[in-house]
Structure formats: structure tokens, C-alpha cells
């Protein structure tokens, strides 16, 4: 299936989407698919975005030493400038025709679905709040012996991030607990915090309500449960390896008991969301179940008044506004880049460098990884890579669920280790609030899960391969 974009370009006939381009057609290893050289200049908007967002971000962070300076760059403005550059290209198309292209890109069913899920997921997190997730964390730490505290931190981070669907939220919640565990023992703070960051990326990769999962599945047109099943068998070996490594490093040491209160009733919404997602219930139904159960619990236990509950839902959904706007702007920009021949040029280069199905899978992973290094946002990286990956799936014979799995996994690998990513910066900030000064490079030495996830992914690509039905 050539996908949405190919159909839309046909719909716009007789508009000329390419001007004086030298196309070359030849057979590819994946089975006789034509290959176009495209127009590399059409990729200029992406370059402009990278200069504005990555360049200025690094300058603010490391040149001007502004705390979390990388995230002081308004990503929406950076994309607006990039879209302006795209609109100035290809004079054979009028501005109205370019607006039509952008409108059709934004109006894609997958984009609309993704936006609605973002808002529902935000409302869910707003309803249940941090106290519910904290109950999950302290409950698991309570039932497992304290001497396994660091290993428990990893398990808790995996579970909470899978239930919450956010790595940053998990790190914000658990980093103070990690510092407390380190203070109650002779474990290094960097080890405890690095373990939490790794576990948080596990759930970010697998959760049904994670924006990365939503973006990857909707962008590639696959069911979330299918992506989860394939992704799980890549993530599980890495998680087990991380757990074994952490146990080997910490066994034999005793820690003081961590006595914090928790409320079992507050765990129910997260459990419902997790179970509903695993069994394959429609994601909207799952989120509505979580929102409804969370609302009933909050009202029944007098933790929120009805007005406060509505305000919390609105605040949670509002937290997704920037992510939603970025998805809209990326869809518009990618529509123009595709029409101008930019994606054909990028695909031409990838086909030249990577051969066969396995090479295509690696190329897809490196593509989204490069996007993530540039944007420091794995959701944005996936949204940007989606249309290119869709073409690669057809060319290299990669199934939609495999493509979604690769995009999500590799984006989480890169996002979990870059020193200027939100996850790392939030962890450092949380440590500082607890009175502990630590650098990103201290933590990077203990990020066992992302490193092992890379190994597991490469084994899945080159040794095991994709099972075809």
C-alpha cells in the first residue's frame, strides 16, 4: 500500500509537484519498486528547523548556561519558520495550492486520531494525578524487601511508565524516591537515578497511552496491540538483562525500610488502563474507562470536588496542546516536502546505503534516531519520520507493525541517552531539588536499559528477523 500521501498527490493532478527534477527509475532489492532521485533542496526546511531548534538550544544550554536552556526554544515557532521556508520553495505551485497540500496533510485520518488520543490521554493523567502514580510506586516498594531497592526502582519505573504513558512524568515522580534509596544505603545516586530513567523509557516505548506509541501506530497504520506484541519481545530481553545487571551490582547490600503511605484504591485506574490496553480494547474505550474510574474514585474519596475534577481534566488535556500543535505543523511541513520531492531524495539515499529487508529496518531505526538527536523529542522525531518510514515499509517489505515497533524503539533508545533530552534534564533538576548535584554524564554511565535495548533491537533485526505470516 502506497499510503495516504501517494493518493493525495494523485488527487491533485494536474498540479505539478516537481519542477525540473531528474528522476531515475530502476529496480530495488525489495522487488522492482521504482526509485526517484528527488530534490534534495526540498529538505531545506528540516535543516532550517534543526539550526533553529538544535543549534540555538545547544547554545542556550552550554554556551549561555541557561538551566534547561534547550527547552527554552519554542518548538512551534521553529516549525513555523520551517514551513515558511517550504512555502517559498517550488514556484510552480501557487500559495493556495500549497495551502491545499498542507490542509490535506493535516486532515489525514491518522493525524486526527492521534490528536484525539493525545487529548484523552492528557485528560486521564489530569484526573488521576500524581498521587495515584505515587501510590503505585510506594505499594510496589512496600511489598518487596528493601535490599532489592534498586531493582525494585527499575520494576516500579517500568510499571508506572507503562501505566502513565509518560517517561518524564515517571522520572519526576520516582527520582526523589531514587535519591531517598541512595541516601538510605551506599548505592550511588547516579545508579539509582539511571535505573529510574531506564525503566521510564521501557514504559514510554510500550505503553498504550504513550504519545510515541500513538504516533508510531497511527502513522504506520497498525493496531496498538500488534505493535505491543512485537515490541514486547524486543524490550523484554533488555529489561531482564538490565534487572540481572542491577541485581549483580547491588546484591548483598542492605537498605533502610522506605515507609511511605499509599492508597490501593487509587491504583485501580492505572490497572484498568494497562489491562485494557493489553487485551486489545479500543484505545478510546480504554482511556474513557480510566477517566471514568479515576473520576469516580476522586469524587468518592473526597480528594476532588466536581469543579476541581473538571479543571484537572482541562489542565491535563491542555498539557497536550503543544504536542498536538507540533503534530499538526509537522504534518503540514511534511506534505510540502513530499510534494517538492524531498522525501524521494532521502529515500534514494537510504536505498543506496541500506540493502535488503534487514538493511531497511536498520535504516529506518537510524532515520528516527537522527531525527531524535536533532529535536530531543522522540514524539516529534516519530511524527517527522512517519511519512518517510511509510515509503520505506513498502519498498523494503517491512510490515506496518514492525515499522511502528522500530520507530518507537529506536526513538526511545536515542531519547533515553542524549544528555540534553527532557528525561535527563528533569532527572537532574529533581536531584538538585533534593540537594544532590549530579551531571547528565554521571547518569549516562548507568543507563543500562537503553544500551541493552539497542543490542536487543539489532539482534531482532539481523539474527531473528521479522516473522511473516
Predicted regions and their residues:
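Hydrophobic alpha-helical transmembrane segments of multi-pass integral membrane proteins
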Residues: 114-125, 145-177, 353-390, 395-396, ...
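Alpha-helical transmembrane segments of multi-pass membrane proteins
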Residues: 117, 147-160, 186-203, 359-372, ...
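Membrane-interfacial loop-to-helix junctions in multi-pass transporters
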Residues: 108-114, 138-156, 182-192, 236, ...
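Hydrophobic mid-bilayer segments of alpha-helices in multi-pass membrane transport proteins
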Residues: 41-54, 69-91, 112-120, 151, ...
Amino acid at each position: 500500500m502506497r499510503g495516504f500521501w501517494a493518493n493525495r498527490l494523485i488527487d491533485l493532478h494536474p498540479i505539478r509537484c516537481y519542477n525540473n527534477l531528474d528522476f531515475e527509475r530502476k529496480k530495488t532489492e525489495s522487488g522492482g519498486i521504482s526509485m526517484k532521485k528527488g530534490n534534495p533542496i526540498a529538505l531545506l526546511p528540516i535543516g532550517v528547523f534543526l539550526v533553529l531548534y538544535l543549534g540555538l538550544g545547544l547554545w542556550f544550554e552550554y554556551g549561555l548556561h541557561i538551566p534547561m536552556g534547550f527547552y527554552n526554544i519554542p518548538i512551534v515557532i521553529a516549525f513555523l519558520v520551517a514551513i515558511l521556508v517550504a512555502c517559498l520553495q517550488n514556484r510552480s505551485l501557487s500559495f493556495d495550492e500549497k495551502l491545499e497540500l498542507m490542509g490535506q496533510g493535516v486532515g489525514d485520518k491518522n493525524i486526527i486520531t492521534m490528536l484525539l488520543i493525545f487529548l484523552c490521554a492528557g485528560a486521564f493523567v489530569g484526573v488521576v494525578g500524581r498521587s495515584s502514580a505515587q501510590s503505585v510506586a510506594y505499594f510496589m516498594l512496600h511489598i518487596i524487601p528493601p535490599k532489592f531497592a534498586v531493582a525494585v526502582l527499575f520494576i516500579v519505573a517500568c510499571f508506572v511508565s507503562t501505566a502513565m504513558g509518560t517517561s518524564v512524568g515517571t522520572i519526576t515522580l520516582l527520582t526523589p524516591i531514587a535519591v531517598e534509596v541512595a541516601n538510605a544505603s551506599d548505592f550511588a545516586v547516579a545508579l539509582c537515578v539511571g535505573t529510574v530513567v531506564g525503566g521510564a523509557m521501557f514504559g514510554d516505548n510500550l505503553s498504550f497511552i504513550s504519545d510515541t506509541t500513538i504516533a508510531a501506530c497511527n502513522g504506520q497504520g497498525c493496531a496498538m496491540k500488534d505493535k505491543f506484541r512485537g515490541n514486547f519481545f524486543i524490550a523484554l530481553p533488555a529489561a531482564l538483562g538490565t534487572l540481572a545487571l542491577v541485581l549483580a551490582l547491588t546484591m548483598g547490600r542492605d537498605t533502610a525500610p522506605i515507609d511511605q503511605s499509599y492508597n490501593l484504591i487509587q491504583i485501580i485506574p492505572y490497572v484498568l488502563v494497562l489491562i485494557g490496553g493489553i487485551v486489545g480494547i479500543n484505545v478510546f474505550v480504554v482511556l474513557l474507562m480510566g477517566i471514568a474510574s479515576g473520576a469516580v474514585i476522586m469524587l468518592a474519596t473526597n480528594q476532588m470536588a466536581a469543579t476541581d475534577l473538571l479543571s484537572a481534566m482541562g489542565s491535563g488535556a491542555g498539557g497536550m496542546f503543544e504536542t498536538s500543535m507540533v503534530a499538526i505543523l509537522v504534518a503540514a511541513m511534511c506534505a510540502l516536502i513530499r510534494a517538492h520531492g524531498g522525501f524521494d531524495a532521502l529515500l534514494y539515499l537510504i536505498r543506496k546505503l541500506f540493502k535488503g529487508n534487514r538493511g531497511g529496518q536498520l535504516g529506518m531505526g537510524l532515520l528516527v534516531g537522527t531525527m531524535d538527536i536533532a529535536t530531543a523529542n522522540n514524539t516529534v522525531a516519530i511524527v517527522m519520520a512517519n511519512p518517510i518510514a511509510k515509503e520505506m515499509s513498502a519498498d523494503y517489505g517491512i510490515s506496518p507493525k514492525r515499522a511502528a515497533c522500530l520507530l518507537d524503539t529506536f526513538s526511545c533508545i536515542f531519547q533515553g541517552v542524549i544528555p540534553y533530552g527532557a528525561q535527563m534534564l528533569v532527572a537532574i533538576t529533581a536531584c538538585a531539588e533534593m540537594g544532590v548535584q549530579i551531571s547528565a554524564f554521571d547518569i549516562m554511565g548507568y543507563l543500562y536499559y537503553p544500551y541493552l535495548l539497542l543490542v536487543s533491537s539489532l539482534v531482532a533485526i539481523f539474527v531473528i528477523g521479522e516473522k511473516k505470516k
